Amino acid sequence: MVGEDRVIMSVKELRRVHVIRQTREKKLTQVQAGIVLGLTPRHIRRLIERVAQAGDQGLAHRGRGKPSNRRIPEKVQTKALTLYAQRYGDFGPTLAAEKLAERHGITLSAETVRGWLLAKGVTHFQRRKRPHRAWRERKAHVGELVQLDGSHHDWLEGRGPRCVLMAYIDDASSRVYARFYAYEGTIPAMDSFQRYIQRYGIPLAIYADKHSTYHSPAEPTVAEQLAGVEPRSQFGRALGELGVELIPAHSPQAKGRVERLFKTFQDRLIKELRLAGGSTLDEANRFLEDYLPIYNQRFSVQPVQPADLH
């Protein structure tokens, strides 16, 4: 009997069996049993009655072996997995759960979707262990430092031309501004920065890599050497006239926030553009106008200090 109980009972239930037996054998009072199990004497009496009627099995959870009332109906699971296979096969569980709710009215947690996919042998989304990195503390104020970079990628997945996403991410808040261009160069840099200014104002500093668009590759002239200044690109001169400091990043790791943004966008944004049917630069940029406010509302953070230094 005990062996059978042990198969179907939890450790907590087995402990109750032992204590209730001791109580029925008058080795413990009901008050003492209640103290041991953390239950009231009234509850102890109910357990004693249950054992008297059904034996030790009466202390097993009454819902064990029965389907949970909270269990998601099988037809919902089937529909969700069918939609995933048909439309979202390369999506991770989080984005898939968002789209199932947003586009099909099927509300599921990401962990539920993850579990269903793993049970079906779908594992492409498994998280990989990230290499350890030394985190640089964020700036305290919005507008104090903005990271800028361009990402060359097949953003439209062959539906349109390859293009470059010029992205600005505020260091203090992770707020993002971005726009697609045909190439990464002076004109796209100037145009995107002008649009950034019109939207948010002039930041104190821009942090960009050593691409020739941002930092001149020319050797300093004798006059520049004597003056202790570096040659500047056209973009660098424009920032200088606005009083914006242009800080060079010497490695991709130094631009950690914008590099991580591109990894996120190369997963999420590409799929969102696919669902929206974007196939031209104009369509992609119109999509960004609606997408970025939603993205920023979800993923930006509260800066340490409330003042905006733009």
Where are these regions (language model features)?
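Short alpha-helical elements of helix-turn-helix
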Residues: 11-17, 78, 163
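Mobile genetic element proteins and their domesticated derivatives, centered on retroelements
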Residues: 19, 33, 44-47, 55, ...
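Residues that mark the N-terminal boundary/hinge immediately upstream of a DNA-recognition element
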Residues: 28-29, 92
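Basic, flexible linker segments flanking DNA-binding modules
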Residues: 55-154, 222-230, 308-310
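Mobile-element integrase/transposase regions
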Residues: 75-76, 86, 106, 118-176, ...
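Acidic/histidine-rich, metal-coordinating catalytic segments
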Residues: 197-227, 249-252, 308
